[in-house]
């Protein structure tokens, strides 16, 4: 299969996986909000935000570093096995840290449920670590359809078990156990698939581990900072305002997680192309790939952001019921930040490709300080609305900074021709939604048709020039 078809297939496979997993996530949210109630659902969201934090935090940049190494030199298979061994070796101490910190942060008498649920979820750290470490092998080979298959399988297992939890009337502990089992299924299938193309026996090599950490750490610190400020709002909200506030915010947050997962399939497809263009110092090709990816991301973000703002009450009511009506405002706020994250992620990968990790680190540190300071000041008074506002403000600050950095490092200034067409389509879509009866399915169909029709009339597909992206040099 040639490069164009491989990139297209990877993109399609991951997009399909995101649709399926997002659908399963919506189903589980629908079930759990009604079964557990606001506070119970708040405990579940707290756990699902808290545990993955440690997986990404202790990634130390290894995932992206290994992908970059394997993309440039496929013969360096030991890098994969070294990183796999290192990630597994880090899993035990990170699990202990996660447990100890949970006992400290949620030590109140009324927070026993949260503490116990986190303890049940601790195996997630190992399973998610293995899945992440093995997934890089497929990412570097542009075979992300395997990762997509495993992700769907794991989500399906978890969703099936959550249905049993609800039918059986079990507690939040059983719901957390279902998520752990789904993560195990995902990791196990990835290991089985990886064995067909590479040995998955971890290498015990402390000296090479140290060298890996030294090389990956600048990037790792940037990613650590990014995950802290992405998850800090929900964690701080759970500490400062309790499970009920997290339950309300959790509806918006879970939708945010589902939405921002979609651009990931494009990032992982174009990152090897960006890396190789940067390694050849082919800035024209790098800018071309970046522009085409930027256009696709903007086209996707505009209807998501404007559509969600327009029909947020219908979304919340359908997803969680009238007990969660207060989630409408934070949803409208965080969805703006989600749209900004589409583009921010791409620009961050461009900086990584051109070896500007240290600069990216300082940018993330500045944004994190901004985020934490505002959250600590505003959450005690404004609760989940403050958390949502700070998250979106942080993404806006990050966008401005990244645009400047990408311009300086790669000479890239985004052309806004496609973005302008998307804005016109979005405006027409919102106008159509304003006169459409309040039925979620009907609103989604009308909005999608209106947006798509405007894009076709403006011949937006001709402006995308996707063949240039798919035909980028490798």
Where are the predicted features?
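Signature of the first transmembrane helix
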Residues: 3-63, 95, 99, 106, ...
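Alpha-helical transmembrane segments of multi-pass membrane proteins
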Residues: 53, 57, 92, 96, ...
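Small-residue-rich midsections of specific transmembrane alpha-helices
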Residues: 18-28, 45-70, 125-133, 186-189, ...
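Interhelical loop/hinge segments that connect adjacent transmembrane helices in multipass membrane
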Residues: 1-7, 172, 188-230, 234, ...
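Hydrophobic alpha-helical transmembrane segments
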Residues: 118-119, 150-196, 215, 365-371, ...
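Membrane-water interface segments that mark the loop-to-transmembrane alpha-helix transition
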Residues: 8-22, 47, 59-103, 116-119, ...
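Membrane-proximal transmembrane or re-entrant/amphipathic helices at the cytosolic face
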Residues: 415, 434-474
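Specific pore-lining/lateral-gate transmembrane helices of multi-pass inner-membrane transport
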Residues: 69-86, 248-365
């Amino acid at each position: 299969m040639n490069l164009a078809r491989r990139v297209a297939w990877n993109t399609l496979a991951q997009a399909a996986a995101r649709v399926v997993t997002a659908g399963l996530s919506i189903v589980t949210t629908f079930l759990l909000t009604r079964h557990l109630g606001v506070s119970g659902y708040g405990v579940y969201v707290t756990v699902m935000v808290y545990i993955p934090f440690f997986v990404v935090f202790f990634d130390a940049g290894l995932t992206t570093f290994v992908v970059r190494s394997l993309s440039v030199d496929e013969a360096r298979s030991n890098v994969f096995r070294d990183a796999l061994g290192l990630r597994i070796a880090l899993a035990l101490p990170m699990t202990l840290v996660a447990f100890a910190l949970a006992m400290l942060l949620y030590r109140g008498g009324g927070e026993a449920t949260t503490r116990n649920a986190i303890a049940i979820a601790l195996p997630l750290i190992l399973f998610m670590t293995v899945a992440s470490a093995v997934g890089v092998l497929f990412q570097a080979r542009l075979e992300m359809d395997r990762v997509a298959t495993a992700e769907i399988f794991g989500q399906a297992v978890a969703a099936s078990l959550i249905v049993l939890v609800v039918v059986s009337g079990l507690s939040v502990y059983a719901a957390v156990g279902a998520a752990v089992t789904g993560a195990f299924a995902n990791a196990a299938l990835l290991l089985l698939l990886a064995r067909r193309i590479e040995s998955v026996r971890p290498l015990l090599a402390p000296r090479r581990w140290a060298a890996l950490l030294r090389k990956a750490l600048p990037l790792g610190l940037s990613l650590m900072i990014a995950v802290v400020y992405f998850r800090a709002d929900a964690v701080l909200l759970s500490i400062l305002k309790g499970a009920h506030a997290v339950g309300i915010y959790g509806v918006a947050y879970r939708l945010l997680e589902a939405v921002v997962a979609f651009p990931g399939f494009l990032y992982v497809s174009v990152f090897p192309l960006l890396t190789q263009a940067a390694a050849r110092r082919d800035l024209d090709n790098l800018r071309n790939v970046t522009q085409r990816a930027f256009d696709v991301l903007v086209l996707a973000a505009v209807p998501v952001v404007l559509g969600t703002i327009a029909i947020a009450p219908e979304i919340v009511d359908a997803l969680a019921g009238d007990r969660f009506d207060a989630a409408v405002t934070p949803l409208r706020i965080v969805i703006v930040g989600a749209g900004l994250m589409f583009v921010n992620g791409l620009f961050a990968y461009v900086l990584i490709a051109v070896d500007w990790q240290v600069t990216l680190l300082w940018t993330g540190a500045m944004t994190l300080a901004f985020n934490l300071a505002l959250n600590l000041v505003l959450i005690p008074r404004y609760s989940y609305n403050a958390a949502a506002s700070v998250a979106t403000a942080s993404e806006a600050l990050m966008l401005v900074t990244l645009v400047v950095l990408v311009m300086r490092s790669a000479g890239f200034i985004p052309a806004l021709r496609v973005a302008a067409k998307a804005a016109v389509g979005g405006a027409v879509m919102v106008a159509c939604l304003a006169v459409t009866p309040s039925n979620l399915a009907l609103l989604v169909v009308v909005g999608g048709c209106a947006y798509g029709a405007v894009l076709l009339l403006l011949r937006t597909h001709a402006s995308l020039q996707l063949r240039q992206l798919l035909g980028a040099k490798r």
